[in-house]
Amino acid sequence: MSRFIQGDCVRVMATFPGNAVDFILTDPPYLVGFRDRQGRTIAGDKTDEWLQPACNEMYRVLKKDALMVSFYGWNRVDRFMAAWKNAGFSVVGHLVFTKTYTSKAAYVGYRHECAYILAKGRPALPQKPLPDVLGWKYSGNRHHPTEKPVTSLQPLIESFTHPNAIVLDPFAGSGSTCVAALQSGRRYIGIELLEQYHRAGQQRLAAVQRAMQQGAANDDWFMPEAA
C-alpha cells in the first residue's frame, strides 16, 4: 500500500484514520526562507502557520507507543519544540549527523544536521540502539535543494521499525525517506506539496523499484536448484 502523494500534508493526513502509521521520519521546512545557489526555494519556509496543524495531524495518525524523528532548524527550535509538545509528543532523544563539508558559513561553518526523536506514548526500546552521532554523506541535492541522504535515513528506519511497517513522511520532498523505507523492506507514505519534487520522487522511486526487481531476478537466475 505504499503511496507517494502530491498535496498539502495537513489536508492529506486529515483523510487518514487515527493510529495508522508505525513511524514518522520527516524533514519539514526550517522556517528560514531558504534559497540555494540555483535559486531553488522550499514551500512554507517563510511562515510557521502550517507547523502546529501538521504536528497535530502527525500525532493523530501515528500509532500509540511509536516514534517520530524530525529534522528541524536549529535557530527555530523554540517554535518546533512548542508545536511538538502542544501536539502531545514527548522528547526522548536527539541525533547529530556530522558532515564532511561546510554547507554554509556565517559566524561558524555549518557541518552538522540535527533531529529530535519524539514519542507518542511509551515506545519499546530498539534491540540495537543507534549512537546519537551518525555520519552524513553528501547527497548532491540533485533531486531537491535540501535532499537528505538515504544512507543516513535508512539506519533510523531499520532501528525503529520492523519489516513491513508503515513509514510516513509528510514533507517528503523528492522521496529520500520513501526510498530508504523501500530499501529496508518497509511500506511508505510520502506527501509532497510541489509538483516538481513530487514528480522527481516518483521517478526516483520507480528507478529504485526497477533496480531492486532486477537484483532479485539476478539472484533467482544464479540460485542453485534444490537437491
From Swiss-Prot:
EC number: 2.1.1.-
Keyword Lipoprotein: no
Domain of life from the UniProt record: Bacteria
Keywords noted in UniProt: Methyltransferase, Plasmid, Transferase
One matching Pfam family: N6_N4_Mtase
InterPro entries in UniProt: DNA_methylase_N4/N6 (IPR002941), DNA_methylase_N6_adenine_CS (IPR002052), RM_Methyltransferase (IPR001091), SAM-dependent_MTases_sf (IPR029063)
Coiled coil: none
Cysteine disulfide links: none
GO biological process, one term: methylation
Record bears the keyword Transferase: yes
GO molecular function: DNA binding; N-methyltransferase activity
Gene3D superfamilies: Vaccinia Virus protein VP39
Family annotation (PANTHER family): RNA METHYLASE-RELATED (PTHR13370), TRNA (GUANINE(10)-N2)-METHYLTRANSFERASE HOMOLOG (PTHR13370:SF3)
Family indicated by similarity: Belongs to the N(4)/N(6)-methyltransferase family.
Role noted for this protein: A putative beta subtype methylase whose recognition site is unknown.
Name of the protein described by the UniProt record: Putative methylase YubD
